[in-house]
Amino acid sequence: MEDRILTHCPHCQASNRLPADRIADAPVCGRCGEPLLAGQPLELSDANFDAVATASVQPLLVDFWAPWCGPCRMMAPAFEQAGKTLAGRALLAKVNSDDNPQLSARFGIRSIPTLVRIAKGHETARQSGALPASAIVALAGV
């Protein structure tokens, strides 16, 4: 079975299932036809992470977080704002470290929130702790 990512259209809020390995193909909403990745962070998992990381031609900035983490919740709006600023230049994604322990272990996540930048399939930068949108944009390196 093909790995898929569930995302919501920022224009009409329709749910869309995207093949993870086609994320770089500028997907559009099945309902309204507008671009789906207009700065919206993707929700990634143990199952679909590798397909997205290898398919992305843009840098991938991943936020490892947990729902119970106060600083993670505090940084969430800044991460979304950075996503809008970086639209078309970088792909932003979130990984719930509680739901995806294998991925968190693979990246050696010891504290959250932790942002990891991946380019061409390799980690190129890492920063732990809550950051403002301007610092998140700078970490993306584009």
Show where each model-derived region lies.
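Non-catalytic, surface beta->alpha helical segment in thiol-disulfide oxidoreductase systems
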Residues: S111, V116-V142
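Short cysteine-rich clusters marking metal-coordination/redox-active sites
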Residues: C9-C12, C29-C32
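A short beta-strand-turn-helix
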Residues: P41-L60
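Short linker/helix segments within small regulatory modules
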Residues: L18-P27
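Thiol-based oxidoreductase modules, predominantly thioredoxin-like and allied folds used
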Residues: L44, F64, M75-Q102, I109
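Cys/His-enriched microdomains
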Residues: T7, P27, P67
